[in-house]
Amino acid sequence: NTTQASMASNIGLCAIADAAKEMGYHNAISNASDIYSANSFQPPMTIGTVQASPLTMANVYATMGANGVECTPIAITKVTDRSGSKVKVPSANCHQAIDPDIAQTVSYALNQGVVQPGGEASTTQLDNNRKTFAKTGTNENTVMTTAGFVPNQVAAFVAVADAQDPINNTFDNKTINGVYRPSWYGMYIATPAWKQFMNTYLAAINAPIDND
């Protein structure tokens, strides 16, 4: 965390927030949707204090996987009326959010966290030695996360201790599935769930392995 704080002091919060917003990052709280709000625009934002939704995180990771091209998540890909005529669907508004070289540099760092000995994301490595770009995360023992991507596929998983009152009902000193831990981290629940989904889905669609 200290390295992130040092980086933020050199780059400046405005530049960081601008880049994050371009990549689709925003606060999920209904009354504080702007990343520049007092709730979000603070030095700790660099270590993940903005309350982003799983969909937002998946979109940000997708932007990095697409060489910096950000597209608004659209659930509908095609609509036809009863006569078979196509109905216009919302645009994904795809645009170059960040420089491709920057996106590739971040992606390289994500992959190194997977492949390097002792890497914090080493448990995210997918089957068949498929090149994996992922990151685990934990926030005050209230949320466990894992997000990541391979070419043309991205996913984000979040486990919340108590959606109604996460501050007072944390993962601290909990027994889950017969396992007790004083503290729970992203690698314990979020990573296995993310990894199982990715492996199952990639196998089901016969996704080619692209490790370039």
Task: Indicate residue ranges for each PLM-predicted region.
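Glycine-centered secondary-structure boundary/capping sites
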Residues: 12, 24-25, 34-35, 175-177, ...
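Repeat-unit-sized solenoid/scaffold elements
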Residues: 26-46, 184-197
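A penicillin-recognizing enzyme superfamily signal
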Residues: 5, 51-212
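Active-site-adjacent helix/loop patches that line small-molecule binding or acyl-intermediate pockets
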Residues: 1-27, 38-66, 112
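Active-site-adjacent bridging/hinge elements
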Residues: 20-38, 126, 159, 165-172
